[in-house]
């Protein structure tokens, strides 16, 4: 595996992790908001 390909795969992995954290935070906040409004 070439270094550039390895860097590309790592950037994809980190991008997926960041998106997952953002999505998880949005879902968590929306769930809490719904409970508080009721």
UniProtKB/Swiss-Prot annotation:
<comment type="function">
    <text>Involved in the binding and/or turnover of quinones at the Q(B) site of photosystem II (PSII). PSII is a light-driven water plastoquinone oxidoreductase, using light energy to abstract electrons from H(2)O, generating a proton gradient subsequently used for ATP formation.</text>
</comment>
<feature type="transmembrane region" description="Helical">
    <location>
        <begin position="8"/>
        <end position="28"/>
    </location>
</feature>
<keyword id="KW-0472">Membrane</keyword>
<comment type="subunit">
    <text>PSII is composed of 1 copy each of membrane proteins PsbA, PsbB, PsbC, PsbD, PsbE, PsbF, PsbH, PsbI, PsbJ, PsbK, PsbL, PsbM, PsbT, PsbX, PsbY, PsbZ, Psb30/Ycf12, peripheral proteins PsbO, CyanoQ (PsbQ), PsbU, PsbV and a large number of cofactors. It forms dimeric complexes.</text>
</comment>
<dbReference type="GO" id="GO:0009523">
    <property type="term" value="C:photosystem II"/>
</dbReference>
<keyword id="KW-0602">Photosynthesis</keyword>
<keyword id="KW-0604">Photosystem II</keyword>
<protein>
    <recommendedName>
        <fullName>Photosystem II reaction center protein X 1</fullName>
    </recommendedName>
</protein>
<dbReference type="Pfam" id="PF06596">
    <property type="entry name" value="PsbX"/>
</dbReference>
<keyword id="KW-0793">Thylakoid</keyword>
<keyword id="KW-1133">Transmembrane helix</keyword>
<dbReference type="InterPro" id="IPR009518">
    <property type="entry name" value="PSII_PsbX"/>
</dbReference>
<dbReference type="GO" id="GO:0031676">
    <property type="term" value="C:plasma membrane-derived thylakoid membrane"/>
</dbReference>
<dbReference type="GO" id="GO:0015979">
    <property type="term" value="P:photosynthesis"/>
</dbReference>
<dbReference type="InterPro" id="IPR023431">
    <property type="entry name" value="PSII_PsbX_type_1_subfam"/>
</dbReference>
<keyword id="KW-0812">Transmembrane</keyword>
<comment type="similarity">
    <text>Belongs to the PsbX family. Type 1 subfamily.</text>
</comment>
